């Protein structure tokens, strides 16, 4: 959006809006941003509240670094899996009980999936509605089709499904190299979004939540190139399954590694991170193939006609 409005420290440019932090400490006045008729910039007296989770487990360096970085900006609570739950997507545990324990550092951990953690937190554990759900920092990239499988994205998506803005942060390469740099970049992004405060009124039935997927190259902070808005790329098919013999003589099967990048053209998350940029992709949950609804409507009509002719009911 090109619309811009300045006044008393407020600049509105759609999602690129920024708010003078002094206004956040002012009395609870609110100013409407004309860039969007349903969005308000809310100026809070109270600190923002952030719920953190991940899929690598509550002891992973990524979530520890992220928590330390974000709690300089807001009140943060961590509810994360007890153990590594990578590639659990948005799975919920429905047929066994879940238990919540608290670690010495105050982190709460659950014997469940990333989505379990966020779901439990939002439906009773916290006792309040956070302003933002943040997941990560993941040990490895979540680009292209990774987002379908990712527990990191799944945790953020659970917050989004509850109408809360959410972000999934991942580091492109495994091993936690430059994790402090990634946490600092994540803090910078969250701070900018906090400045925007792009949320719908609490009483509105159409809460303006959003879901962002962010991938950060493993580089020193001053070497990272600017944030780049991207579409998801695409990988080749996964590598072949790995077959081994167990000590008991049974065949064991290990899921093969993710395929290499296939669609890594300019404009994709793969291309951006390969060039040293931090990639950011807005996601949605609607899996409907809108482009082909017309085709399938015609196909369904022909199928129905065939059924009628054949007399199959």
Residue ranges and their predicted role:
Residues 50, 61-124, 128-129:
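A cross-family phosphate/adenosyl-ligand binding-site feature
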Residues 52-59, 146:
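Short, glycine-rich nucleotide/cofactor-binding loops
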Residues 53, 79-81, 111, 135-138, ...:
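Short beta-strand segments
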Residues 120, 128-173:
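Internal, conserved structured core segments that host functional sites
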Residues 181-313:
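Electrostatically charged, flexible surface regions
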């Amino acid at each position: 959006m090109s619309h811009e409005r300045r006044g008393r420290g407020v600049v509105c440019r759609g999602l690129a809006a920024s708010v003078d932090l002094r206004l956040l400490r002012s009395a609870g006045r609110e100013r409407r941003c004309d860039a969007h008729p349903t969005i308000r910039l809310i100026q809070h007296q109270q600190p923002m509240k952030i719920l953190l989770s991940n899929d690598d487990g509550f002891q992973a360096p990524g979530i520890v670094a992220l928590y330390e970085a974000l709690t300089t900006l807001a009140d943060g609570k961590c509810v994360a899996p007890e153990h590594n739950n990578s590639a659990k997507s948005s799975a919920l545990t429905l047929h066994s009980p879940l238990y919540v324990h608290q670690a010495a550092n105050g982190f709460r951990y659950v014997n469940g999936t990333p989505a379990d953690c966020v779901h439990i937190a939002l439906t009773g554990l916290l006792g309040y509605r956070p302003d933002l759900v943040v997941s990560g920092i993941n040990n490895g990239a979540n680009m292209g089709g990774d987002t379908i499988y990712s527990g990191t994205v799944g945790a953020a998506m659970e917050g989004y499904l509850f109408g809360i803005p959410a972000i999934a942060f991942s580091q492109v390469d495994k091993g936690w190299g430059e994790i402090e740099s990634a946490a600092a970049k994540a803090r910078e992004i969250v701070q900018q979004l906090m400045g925007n405060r792009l949320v719908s009124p609490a009483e509105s039935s159409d809460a303006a939540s959003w879901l962002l997927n962010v991938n950060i190259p493993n580089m020193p902070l001053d070497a990272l190139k600017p944030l780049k808005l991207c579409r998801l790329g695409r990988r080749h098919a996964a590598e072949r399954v790995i077959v081994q013999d167990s000590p008991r003589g049974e065949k064991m099967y290990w899921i093969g590694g993710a395929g290499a990048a296939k669609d890594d053209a300019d404009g994709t998350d793969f291309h951006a991170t390969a060039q040293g940029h931090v990639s950011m992709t807005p996601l949605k949950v609607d899996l409907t193939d809108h482009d082909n609804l017309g085709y399938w409507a015609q196909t369904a009509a022909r199928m129905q006609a065939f059924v009628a002719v054949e007399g199959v009911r």
